[in-house]
Amino acid sequence: TEAIGEVGGFSLTVRDDLRLYLVQVAEKGLAWLNLIADGTAGHGSMRNPDNAVTALAGAVARIGAYDWPHRIHPAQQAFLDAVEDALGIEINADSVEESLARLGTVARMVGATMSNTANPTMLKAGYKVNVIPGQAVAGLDGRFIPGYEEEFFDTITELLGDKVRYEIANRHIAVETEFSGALVDAMQACLQAEDAQAKAVPFLMSGGTDAKGWSTLGVRCFG
């Protein structure tokens, strides 16, 4: 069973005679985490080697500075191959956003799907400037490439160190399907019937869509 989901269907004019229509066939998994540091509460005027804020700040800095290794999903590679062929360029995986700058905002989306990502987004600690809190918490938005969920969590655990732990606030699977079948053929045929320069290409989505829900029902979802 197949479905057409909520993202995709937009085009990129890469040459006068070629427009790429992006069809989502995969998307990253989601891991929203609370990073928690426990320490010793006390007065702000005292020395405190067990400061929860200090421990959390170090962990957040390590995660923010970490350079995640490239993990090129087949859908991502198919998209990159199509763009390389269309533009006559060689895309450098270390500077993909610069290589694809002429594609506009799509370049950032492609850059985000070259690897797992983890962005600290929220901080919570203390209630008064002269009181050292016993706990500090940060919110983290993590996204992992299909097939690399275990690597994502192992890396986060290592970066947190001994004094910080994580709790999962929200977790959703990564989704993928092959760019093939009768529906894909029909998409290409319909596009070319309306646009002679059209070519459908697969891509990997950095965010989350209804494809996650459909996949749990055994439905292949294209965006």
Task: Mark where each language-model region is.
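A glycine-rich helix N-cap at a beta->alpha junction
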Residues: 1-9
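Metal-dependent amide/peptide-bond hydrolase catalytic core
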Residues: 8-223
